[in-house]
From Swiss-Prot:
Glycans are attached at residue 174. It is found in: Golgi apparatus membrane. The keyword Endoplasmic reticulum does not apply. The lineage of its organism: Eukaryota, Viridiplantae, Streptophyta, Embryophyta, Tracheophyta. It comes from Arabidopsis thaliana (Mouse-ear cress). Residues 57-261 are lumenal. The chain crosses the membrane at residues 36-56. GO terms for molecular function: methyltransferase activity. Its EC number is 2.1.1.-. Disruption phenotype: Plants lacking both CGR2 and CGR3 (cgr2-1 cgr3-1) exhibit severe defects in plant growth and development (e.g. shorter hypocotyl and primary root length due to reduced cell elongation, and abnormal pollen tube elongation), as well as reduced levels of pectin methylesterification associated with decreased microsomal pectin methyltransferase activity. The double mutant cgr2-1 cgr3-1 also lacks uronic acids and methyl ester. One of its GO terms (cellular component) is endosome. This is Probable pectin methylesterase CGR2. Keywords: Cell wall biogenesis/degradation, Glycoprotein, Golgi apparatus, Membrane, Methyltransferase, Transferase, Transmembrane, Transmembrane helix. One of its GO terms (biological process) is positive regulation of developmental growth. InterPro entries: CGR2/3, SAM-dependent_MTases_sf. The gene is CGR2.
């Protein structure tokens, strides 16, 4: 069977400027007290913005806007309605793999006729009580994805992975990606960072183990061929149609995959 090159959907977000930069510059010769007040007011507004919003989980997308980082896990939550259109019944039993999986599981469980589970690859000691309740109920597991996943083959209709693979070396990708495909019956959706996107700072390296590696679409396509994966045509086309209609504007690379038969 001829192998199809896997396409990706992406859109690089427009840059923005810090809203208080002009004010601080114009007041540079004012009294030190006024300058300090402006800085404090700006900081309070940003912190309030980052932690506001509906839902029991803080939005990592909003936090990323403040810190300058970008999270593909936040993208997953934005893309859920479009993924449901693309996969239909394939969204019955979903496994999400990646950092902050509790927030994704929470969003998925709000969808009708959708069951959801998550694998958190990193420590969750700082997680809130709602996330820890997911762990106690078995909806979320903390597991090192460098090793086999604790699930039987085709346990889930769809597996969605975000952010986690960007921190793995090719050595471990060769083991982890086939594992993701093994536990999925209808396919795997990979949300990967774009080259040039900012990710983990030095302070976070102790958690992730290594800096994020933002790989190009061509790199991923070669890798998929090597690991016997191909584009999942039908849902990929539906997803692209939704993007072309403006229903969703991805800021990460999105790959729709299935095993090569």
């Amino acid at each position: 069977m001829a192998r199809r090159q896997v396409g990706s959907t992406r859109r690089v977000g427009d840059g923005g400027s810090f809203p208080f930069a002009g004010a601080l510059h114009s007041k540079s010769r004012s009294s030190p007290l006024l300058s300090i007040c402006l800085v404090l007011v700006g900081a309070c507004l940003l912190i309030g913005y980052a932690y506001s919003g509906p839902g029991i989980f803080k939005s990592i997308k909003e936090v990323s806007k403040v810190t300058g980082d970008y999270s593909c896990t936040a993208e997953v939550q934005r893309a859920i309605p479009v993924l449901k259109k693309a996969y239909g019944d394939g969204m019955r039993k979903v496994l999400h793999v990646g950092p902050d999986t509790c927030s994704v599981v929470s969003s998925l469980l709000k969808e009708e006729e959708t069951e959801a589970w998550g694998v958190e690859p990193y420590d969750i000691e700082d997680a809130d009580s709602h996330c820890k309740s997911f762990v106690s109920k078995g909806l979320v597991r903390v597991a090192d994805i460098k090793f086999p996943l604790p699930y039987r083959a085709k346990s889930f209709s769809l597996v969605i992975v975000s952010d986690a693979l960007d921190y793995l070396s090719p050595k471990y990708l060769n083991k982890t990606v086939p594992e993701l495909a093994r536990v999925a019956s209808d396919g795997v959706v990979l949300f990967a960072g774009l080259p040039g996107q900012q990710r983990a700072k030095v302070a976070e390296l102790s958690k992730f183990g290594r800096p994020a590696k933002m790989r190009s679409a061509s790199w991923w396509n070669r890798f998929f061929v090597q690991t016997n994966l191909e584009e999942n045509d039908a849902p990929s086309k539906k997803f692209e149609q939704a993007v072309s209609k403006g229903l969703y504007k991805p800021a990460c690379q999105v790959f729709h995959l299935k095993p090569l038969h």
